[in-house]
A protein has these predicted regions:
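Conserved helicase/translocase motor-coupling segment
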Residues: 1-71
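C-terminal accessory regions
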Residues: 73-197
Length: 197
């Protein structure tokens, strides 16, 4: 199984663009494949999909009759069946058949290409990473390392040597200023004042 890993979702080399193009090539429309549009995304039988957030209530079953609930952020599977009359989709995730309603299917996204961030915790036999110039806050050493280490057997870097060099040299992740530190200090001071009353 080959997985394309991108630094971001947006842009010409982001997952949104790649997924559209890869779906067209790898799973084009066919009269025998049912499809449905959810969140402006065409989901088609045979699509490679990923669960976008934890859902502890999605029912699943296994071939041996075992049943349970729960599918997790980052789980990848194949969309096997769309039943528009019943309003359900069946996705095979590893050895489980997961039953989605049209509403819960909004938690699915294409997984022909995923972000490096979203791929964390997964391994793939082969990884392809587009390596073209982009924003420095997305192109840093740890991102490259994370992407490469998702591959079990093979990594293919497609793009420019310069981009790879830039990523290797960029060992600083952009600092984010969320205000969380100041919020936590304020909360701690408030709690201390309440405690001392």
């Amino acid at each position: 199984d080959i997985q394309v890993l991108c630094p971001s979702r947006k842009g010409e080399l982001g997952t949104v663009s790649f997924n559209k193009k890869l779906q067209e090539k790898l799973n084009p429309p066919h009269e025998e494949k049912r499809e449905v549009v959810i969140n402006q995304i065409i989901l088609r039988e045979g699509d490679k999909v990923m669960q976008s957030k934890n859902n502890y209530n999605l029912p699943w079953s296994k071939e041996d009759g075992t049943c349970g609930e729960g599918v997790y952020n980052g789980d990848v599977g194949i969309l096997l069946e769309i039943d528009k009359r019943e309003g359900t989709l069946i996705v095979q995730v590893d050895d489980k058949l997961v039953l989605y309603t049209m509403e819960s299917a909004s938690e699915l996204e294409h997984a022909y290409a995923v972000t490096v961030h979203k791929s964390q915790g997964n391994e793939f036999p082969a990884v392809i990473m587009p390596m073209f110039p982009g924003p420095p806050q997305l192109y840093y050493r740890n991102l490259l390392y994370t992407g490469i280490t998702r591959a079990k057997d093979m990594v293919i870097l497609v793009g420019t040597e310069r981009t790879v060099y830039t990523m290797v040299e960029n060992d600083r992740k952009t600092r984010r200023y969320s205000g969380l530190y100041y919020f936590m200090i304020g909360e701690a001071e408030h709690e201390k004042a309440e405690f001392e009353k």
